[in-house]
Amino acid sequence: MFTTAFAQREQTQPGGLPLDLFAAIDSLKKELNAVILAHYYQEPDIQDIADFIGDSLQLARAAAKTNADVIVFAGVHFMAETAKILNPEKLVLLPDLNAGCSLADSCPPKEFAAFKAAHPDHLVVSYINCSAEIKAMSDIICTSSNAVKIVQQIPKEQPIIFAPDRNLGRYVMEQTGRDLVLWQGSCLVHETFSEKKIVQLKVAHPQAEAIAHPECESSVLRHASFIGSTAALLQYCQTSPSQEFIVATEPGIIHQMQKLAPNKHFIPAPPINNCACNECPFMRLNTLEKLYWAMKNRTPEITMSEDIRIAALRPMQRMLEMSN
């Protein structure tokens, strides 16, 4: 008699995919002693099957604490790199290696090295949305959850470079009163939101609160009643008495908002053009099918040189220490 697991493997679609992907992935998790970490911007099916869902800081903490042998990272490349930096002995898989990040790509290591050399007395605080090479050139890493807190802990006389996101950098400057030297990078998704259309939505929905991620441009942030990381936005929509929200961040988060506040209404902030530009094309590269094949074949694997990993680990550890 076939075992249940064997029978499930036999029930396949054309191309070899199991009929029940959820069950097959669950079986592979047990077989590999794997954990699935997913960002809030992933598609709903991936969020639902993940062992842990979070923002960049939460995911970094989860990666640092996991006892799993295999980390399957449903996110983008820099997030999976972060997991590898913290867990060199573990197998770290990314369902699609092409799942990059426009913000990380906006800060090429060679150009940033020259920028850093032009400011030799500056401390480098880098947003976690950057490559391992940029992390290795940094003194402290931060996330949108803790960027303000991190900068507030740095002595006021210490000049700071903030990279790579200029919009988050401006927000941190406003919140701390510090004068930061900003690298001029940005996220293509968070720069597509239309201020005009958000104002029109607020007129059409006068009871709705606009909430926004600090990667948005200041023209959008000025219309938000609350600004915060993805985790903070989720918390706010649960505790706010408002019943309707205009959400200025990647709309994948609305899946969790609806689960956590099912009686409330969430409106994705529209982009400038009539397109799906407010959806991150890189996050959308990951699918349940790719996640299955990554676990089945134990590839694509995240790798990096040990020199880069060790250099990138130090500012990551400083962040975790300073954000406790």
Curated annotation (Swiss-Prot):
Gene Ontology cellular-component terms listed: cytosol
MF annotations from Gene Ontology: 4 iron, 4 sulfur cluster binding; metal ion binding; quinolinate synthetase A activity
UniProt-annotated binding residues for [4Fe-4S] cluster: 101, 187, 280
Keywords of this entry: 4Fe-4S, Cytoplasm, Iron, Iron-sulfur, Metal-binding, Pyridine nucleotide biosynthesis, Transferase
Signal peptide range: none
EC id: 2.5.1.72
Keyword check for Iron-sulfur: yes
Pfam families assigned to the protein according to its UniProt record, in alphabetical order: NadA (PF02445)
Main location: cytoplasm
Residues that span the membrane, as ranges: none
Job of this protein: Catalyzes the condensation of iminoaspartate with dihydroxyacetone phosphate to form quinolinate.
Name under which the protein is recorded: Quinolinate synthase
Organism: Trichormus variabilis (strain ATCC 29413 / PCC 7937)
Gene, per the UniProt record: nadA
